[in-house]
Regions:
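Blade-terminus and WD-like Trp-Asp/Gly-His loop motifs, strongest in beta-propeller folds
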Residues: 1-2
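Active-site-adjacent structural elements in enzyme catalytic cores
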Residues: 5-351
């Protein structure tokens, strides 16, 4: 593997030569990590079966987990879909480029290696200049999951990628910290009624408003049933998990604080190091080894951005247990809670 400095290409100076090198690597069937507006992606030529296999190998991820295909224009979707659902154009006009992934029936151009063996394909147009330059410059559609090893929190800055992918990939395009920090909303358009398979920044209400029809929410988002074959990435395995055991405590604020402090004391008496995920409002009320505020409770965008970074920080501090407040906020709260519930393996204590 080359020195880290060769791999790193900072946004400020991702010059044409760097971009050309990245595009050449993609065309040659190699892997390049790149920023999107949601998280860093681990990209390869989506229509090249061997390239997609390299992604699974680098991530250590099971290959029945579909990859999202990143495109730069609506015609790219048309070129790989068996049929274009009527909703696709409406949603693309409203939300692309942006954090929305659509699932449609694939045609024969898309190898099963990219779709995790499914007859459907997940497609998104990212809203990030580096991502779009890479797609356009390589002339390839780029399959990319998040650029972390499987089960680790998703990377929101290039240093996270370097840490996880050390020596496994030839290039990281460093675009600085990313904006949203929570993955795209995934909507399945392959059936009669559109269905959200993964909540995200674009909400159910927003989709319904644009489509003027009902959009359902996959019951699996709330339940933890992992027996069905996953149609969307990350639906099957314990995901975004920190190394420590994470438990959510849910209820009225004063009761939550009291209960978490009680749990922290119990763990500390056993000689364990404990972390707490708090908000700006409650931060000073906890007595744990490491208390981190995820932001102001009203500021959903900050909570979303900080979530994965904070889960990684607890890994760095080697805490044994983490307790978190619950963030069932109105707008993207559903998406945030979905991530936290998965990270916690659905361990919730109501108070």
């Amino acid at each position: 593997s080359s020195a880290a400095s060769d791999v790193y290409k900072r946004q400020a100076n991702i010059d044409d030569a760097d971009m050309k090198e990245a595009c050449d690597l993609i065309r040659a069937g190699e892997l390049v990590a790149f920023p999107t507006e949601t998280v860093y992606g681990l990209g390869a030529d989506a229509l090249h079966p061997e390239a997609s296999k390299k992604i699974y190998a680098a991530k250590g991820r099971p290959s029945d987990n579909p990859l999202i295909v990143h495109i730069s224009k609506f015609e790219d979707l048309v070129s790989i879909a068996r049929e274009v659902p009527p909703q696709a154009k409406k949603l693309a006009d409203a939300f692309w480029p942006g954090p929305l992934t659509m699932i449609v029936w694939k045609n024969d151009r898309v190898p099963y290696e990219t779709t995790g063996g499914m007859d459907t394909v997940a497609i998104r147009m990212p809203k990030h200049p580096v991502a779009l330059r890479l797609i356009e410059g390589s002339g390839c559609l780029i399959a990319a999951p998040s650029a972390n090893t499987s089960g680790k929190p998703s990377p929101t800055e290039a240093s996270h990628v370097a840490l996880d992918m050390d020596g496994r990939i030839p290039m990281i395009l460093d675009g600085g910290p990313v904006g949203i920090g929570i993955e795209s909303t995934i909507v399945d358009l392959s059936e009669e009624t559109p269905m959200i398979l993964r909540p995200g920044y674009i909400t159910q209400e927003m989709l319904q408003e644009v489509l003027g029809e009902e959009v359902r929410m996959d019951p699996g988002i709330i339940a933890s049933d992992s027996t069905r074959k996953p149609k969307a990435p990350g639906m099957k395995y314990k995901h975004y998990a920190p190394k420590a055991d994470l438990v959510l405590v849910e209820g009225e604020t004063d009761k939550v604080v009291a209960r978490i402090n009680e749990l922290v004391r119990e763990k500390q008496q056993l000689g364990q190091k404990v972390g707490v995920i708090a908000t700006d409002e409650t931060f000073l009320r906890y007595e744990a080894d490491h208390v981190v505020s995820i932001g102001a409770r009203e500021d959903e965008d900050a909570i979303a951005r900080h979530l994965y970074k904070i889960l990684r920080e607890f890994d760095d501090w080697n805490v044994d247990a983490i307790y978190s407040e619950s963030f069932a906020t109105p707008r993207i709260g559903q998406a945030i809670m979905n991530r936290l519930l998965k990270a916690a393996g659905h361990q919730v204590i109501p108070v």
